[in-house]
């Protein structure tokens, strides 16, 4: 379902936001050397997915928790909720919100409980905001939520309501897109950076490709530059992923 709805407009949004986030991270790391690369990549991942998912713009920060606690309504609060859930997934899945909000709990856990109780309100606000923004723009915007709303509303208008998604189904799809996309993207980038650190010869291989591009990343256009980044893409989308493989083999059962 996701792949069929991710058109070139969303890919372009991912490209543009990734450039901005990566440049901000690079500037910080150059001036503040230390073991913060993996945490920084997590911040890149969640920010890009927030922008591609529902047009939530966030500045890059060295750690995800550095900016939590300020949002109270709408997309900002929903984004903060998703950020907390991705960091404390087991707690979010297993602990009741009343337990999270106890005074003896950590500030992060109390904040998670506060937001999870209000998630239905946030979701409705996000959907209403996106519908209003789409209506003002005169068509769907370049994010995943806008496409889902457009497809669902078109089915309703054409009398095919049995094929349209309810608001709950749309919010569930957005949640999966955000959380699963964050985990996959952050782990893939983190593994790739660790791989490059362990094998410097592949750094040179990637650098040869990048030397053919403009020195100013701000000038990189998606349609022109992305097709040239074949080595970078090969490193990120490899045939041997960081997770363990599970092979299945058919066999006959004899009675």
What are these regions (language model features)?
Residues 53-68:
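Short conserved catalytic/interaction loops centered on acidic-Pro-aromatic/His motifs
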Residues 1-53, 71-128, 215-216:
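Cytochrome P450 catalytic-domain helical core, especially the substrate-recognition surface
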Residues 57-58, 87-94, 126-141, 244-248:
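Proline-centered turn/helix-capping motifs that create local helix->coil transitions or kinks
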Residues 48, 173, 188-192, 235:
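Short, hydrophobic/aromatic alpha-helical segments in well-folded domains
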Residues 112-188, 251:
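Conserved cytochrome P450 catalytic core segment spanning the I/J/K helices
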Residues 2, 49, 82, 148, ...:
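Short alpha-helical scaffolding segments that buttress acidic/His motifs in well-ordered protein cores
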């Amino acid at each position: 379902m996701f792949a069929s709805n991710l058109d070139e407009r969303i890919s372009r949004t991912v490209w543009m936001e990734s450039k901005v986030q990566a440049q901000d991270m690079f500037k910080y790391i150059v001036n503040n050397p230390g073991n913060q690369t993996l945490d920084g990549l997590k911040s890149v991942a969640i920010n890009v997915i927030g922008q591609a998912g529902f047009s939530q713009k966030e500045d890059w920060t060295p750690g995800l928790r550095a900016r939590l606690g300020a949002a109270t309504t709408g997309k900002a609060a929903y984004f903060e909720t998703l950020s907390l859930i991705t960091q404390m997934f087991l707690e979010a899945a297993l602990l009741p919100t009343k337990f999270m909000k106890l005074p003896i709990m950590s500030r992060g856990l109390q904040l998670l409980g506060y937001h999870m109780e209000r998630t239905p309100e946030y979701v409705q606000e996000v959907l209403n905001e996106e519908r209003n923004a789409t209506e003002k723009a005169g068509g769907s915007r370049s994010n995943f939520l806008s496409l889902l709303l457009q497809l669902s509303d078109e089915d309703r208008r054409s009398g095919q309501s049995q094929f349209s998604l309810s608001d709950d189904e749309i919010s569930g799809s957005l949640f999966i897109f955000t959380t699963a996309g964050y985990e996959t993207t952050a782990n893939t980038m983190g593994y790739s950076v660790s791989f490059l650190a362990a094998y410097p010869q592949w750094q040179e291989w990637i650098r040869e490709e990048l030397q053919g591009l403009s020195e100013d990343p701000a000038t990189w256009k998606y349609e022109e530059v992305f097709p040239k980044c074949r080595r970078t893409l090969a490193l990120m989308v490899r045939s041997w992923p960081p997770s363990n493989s599970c092979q299945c083999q058919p066999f006959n059962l004899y009675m």
